[in-house]
């Protein structure tokens, strides 16, 4: 009850940013597992998963640089939201390919890297302007809790669902 009251006492921007961070923390493992499983299911080639991850981590620093220029014209909240939207676009792009080629996987990974880059570059700025010195530790601690909890629980839930579906419908 004390934690809920502490959350309620936070400024609106802090509460909205924490809610967004919590949603992202629970969705991100689903996206990552889905994309790796999709690549493996379509190609059974671990090198393609590695390529995808390499392109993701190539896209992040590229986005940080590009984001700096965009901030001159576009508010960080819009870029932050665009980053989350790009994650869905990456999945949509990859699953709509008629054939999962190396180039297609690379582009999907790069789009996901752009997604992460826009999210993280603008998230840090939004945290700084949405919190004060008095509640910033609360924010980061709560966000770290969500990330840790979701990072442990979501893979367990997803794997349980996959095993259930596999045994019930596949054999």
Model-predicted regions and their roles:
Residues 35, 118-132:
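Intracellular juxtamembrane helix-capping segments at the cytosolic ends
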Residues 63-76, 162-163:
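Helix-to-loop junctions at the C-terminal end of transmembrane segments
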Residues 85-100:
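C-terminal ends and interior cores of transmembrane alpha-helices
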Residues 140-163:
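Glycine-rich segments within core transmembrane alpha-helices of 12-TM secondary carriers
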Residues 2-61:
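Helix-loop boundary and gating motifs at the non-cytosolic
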Residues 57-65, 151-152:
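Residue-level signature of mid-helix packing/kink "hotspots" within the transmembrane helices
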Residues 22, 101-119:
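Hydrophobic core of transmembrane alpha-helices in multi-pass small-molecule transporters
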């Amino acid at each position: 009850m004390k934690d809920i009251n502490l959350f309620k006492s936070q400024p609106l921007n802090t509460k909205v940013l924490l809610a967004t961070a919590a949603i992202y923390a629970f969705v991100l493992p689903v996206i990552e597992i889905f994309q790796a499983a999709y690549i493996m299911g379509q190609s059974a080639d671990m090198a393609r998963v590695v390529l995808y991850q390499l392109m993701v981590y190539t896209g992040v620093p590229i986005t940080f640089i590009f984001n700096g220029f965009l901030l001159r014209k576009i508010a960080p909240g819009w870029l932050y939201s665009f980053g989350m939207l790009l994650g869905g676009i990456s999945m949509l792009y990859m699953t709509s390919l008629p054939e999962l080629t190396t180039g297609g996987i690379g582009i999907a990974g790069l789009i996901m890297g752009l997604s992460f880059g826009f999210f993280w570059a603008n998230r840090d700025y939004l945290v700084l302007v949405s919190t004060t010195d008095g509640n910033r530790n609360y924010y980061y601690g709560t966000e770290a809790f969500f990330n840790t909890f979701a990072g442990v629980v979501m893979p367990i839930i997803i794997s349980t669902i996959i095993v259930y579906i596999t045994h019930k419908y596949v054999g």
